Amino acid sequence: MRFAGKVWRLLVGIKDGLVLVFMLLFFSALFAVLTARPSPASVRDGALLLALDGAIVEERTEVDPFAALLSGQAPMGEYQARDLVHALDKAAEDDRIDAVVLDLDRFVGGGQVHLQEVGEALDRVRAAQKPVLTYATAYTDDSMLLAAHASEVWVNPLGGAVVAGPGGERLYYAGLLDKLKVNARVYKVGEYKSAVEPYNSTGMSEPARENARALYATLWEEYRANMKKARPGADIERVTTQPVEWVTAARGDLATAALQAGLVDKLGSRADFEKRVVELVGDDEWGEGPNAYPHTTLATWLSDNPLPTKGKSIGVITVAGEIVDGDAGPGVAGGDRIAALLDEALDNDLAGLVVRVDSPGGSVLASEVIREAILRQKARKIPVAVSMANVAASGGYWVSTPADRIFAEPETITGSIGIFAVVPTFEETAAMIGVTTDGVRTTPLSGQPDFIGGFTPEADAMMQAFIENGYEDFLSRVGAARGMTRDQVDAVGQGRVWDGGTARQLR
């Protein structure tokens, strides 16, 4: 019995050992299978996929998740121009990337300056002998300008491509305000300061029309020049000057018309496009769908290619969006927030400061808060440069004045040296429904501002004087910064906007 017990224990031990070996082999094989499948967060040999589901921006807007949840809508995607340029430049020199694929089906746009910056980065990818392919159901001005830099532009046969050019119409509310008996009190300095016109006019003034025509003509010329350079074979003149004849010649087929005009290279479905990418980079055995190809997303690629940190630091501050009082942003230029960021950097050993401006302006007070913070940096005797993106106008120019050098692109919209305010009062609206006001004043300013009873003549005059003083401050800041007299600045000011190329020549 003792011998049988030993044999039994031996057999049980062998069984347990075999089970353990089997389990080790099973989990080793399972681990090998799982690790063989590429992680979505890892860079793969193949294509760099830029699925631009949204807009190219200077600075991403801070999203309030609670507000997004209440709205029931996902926020629009935003892609920083500098991230895209950096990603493309790294793709051009990295052997793991064989091609760049742009999915522009849900691309919203980005402004000519950003589009040109990204387009030039695409050119550098092509110069490295790597193909660039784009796909969209339909192309419009911005997506077409970006796609023009690709080696292959694909469009869905049921889609097309249309280039409309800058311009259009805006809404004017003066007639509505008259019917509602709302008094829109306009205070401004600047013959060309057209932002107030929707509130006191039913159409464009001649100065505003003149300014818009000149600006749009220059922007349009830059657009066409960039298109011709990127796609020499595209008949952009016919597409934009004879659109009806162009489309009619293709029997109303916009996709075929785009192909015939050289705007696109291929007509095909998304599946056809993906087959073409597979031909260039190979198929993805782990991918889903019949035409999957190995690719790396933008987020993964940026994580694998951080910005360089060597050398002495150069501070970069972004002023993007409307300039407002307080701590708003990013994506909105809160004056206090940006000033705090600049002041935090006072203790850093900076070789210089670059202020990147992409703003149409806003609050004068917030603009001055930012300007003063830039001056505190400049007091350290470091060089300060301003780099203008799509727009650096009004308050956007105000914050640029401390710079030693200002850089702009030909397509940059700048200037708009002028100040305005619009204050609605409802005395006639109230009277229309039987509400009136009365009282006693000790001074002409007692009870002012009164939005229901209206402004006194003295309050009106003081408001206009305040705006005029602000304009004189603006002129003096620009004059001191650019070495111009007050009258020289006034001659190019008056609220007029300029393209970057023309602004460079003004004196």
Q: Each predicted region: which residue ranges?
A:
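Small-residue-centered hinge/linker elements
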Residues: M1-G252, E274, V278-A481
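Short acidic-hydrophobic, aromatic-tinged amphipathic segments that line or gate anion-handling sites
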Residues: W154-V155, V264-R270, F407-A408, R507
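Amphipathic alpha-helical substructures
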Residues: G233-Q260, K266, A481-R507
